[in-house]
């Protein structure tokens, strides 16, 4: 076996950062559009946000080939669900499906780090954050990807989500208005782009509300 073969890995990390914030009647999901490997930029216009249902949007960083495979599985299972139940999945139902799908592949996992955002059955914003093998939690805000270690302390400082151990159970939604949440997302990405070479080029923001989805774009550093 040559040294080249010995060092071969089925995985790559294509970088990028994803953030989601849940509000009282909205959910903001954002990700940069840079896809890279090592010190090479493969694309400056690659969307990491994927609409799974009218009220559920997935944003993923990691190995983008695995991300695409995961999206295909979720899309096909959601189609089966629609044929059987004559309705679309809610965001919490999609969150459980994503957890089951990731856990099923735990011995050869999808190298994908996911944030799922959307609206629950009551119309409130919800965010679910995952590890690679399906362990997940409903939170008020979350970040995944190469810039998440820079962004999460910033969000913790600004939002301070209540502990899930508090009784009675606290509402996990953030107190921000929709405009404030969008401004905060723009600020954290502008900051992370200064320090993380795998995050940059453009910021794609999706805002989910009961009346539909809006999309915004913002330029980031291109170096």
Curated annotation (Swiss-Prot):
Alphabetic keyword roster: Cytoplasm, Nucleus, Proteasome
Keyword match Cytoplasm: yes
SUPFAM superfamilies cross-referenced by the UniProt entry: N-terminal nucleophile aminohydrolases (Ntn hydrolases)
Any GO CC annotation of this UniProt entry: nucleus
Highest rank taxon of the organism: Eukaryota
GO terms of biological process kind: defense response to fungus; proteolysis involved in protein catabolic process
Induction: During cell proliferation.
Tissue: Present in all tissues examined. Slightly lower levels in roots.
Annotated Gene3D superfamilies: Glutamine Phosphoribosylpyrophosphate, subunit 1, domain 1
Pfam family, any one: Proteasome
Cellular compartments annotated: Cytoplasm; Nucleus
Protein task: Non-catalytic component of the proteasome, a multicatalytic proteinase complex which is characterized by its ability to cleave peptides with Arg, Phe, Tyr, Leu, and Glu adjacent to the leaving group at neutral or slightly basic pH. The proteasome has an ATP-dependent proteolytic activity.
Subunit relationships: Component of the 20S core complex of the 26S proteasome. The 26S proteasome is composed of a core protease (CP), known as the 20S proteasome, capped at one or both ends by the 19S regulatory particle (RP/PA700). The 20S proteasome core is composed of 28 subunits that are arranged in four stacked rings, resulting in a barrel-shaped structure. The two end rings are each formed by seven alpha subunits, and the two central rings are each formed by seven beta subunits. The catalytic chamber with the active sites is on the inside of the barrel.
Family, as annotated: Belongs to the peptidase T1B family.
Protein name: Proteasome subunit beta type-1
Lineage per the UniProt record: Eukaryota, Viridiplantae, Streptophyta, Embryophyta, Tracheophyta
Gene: PBF1
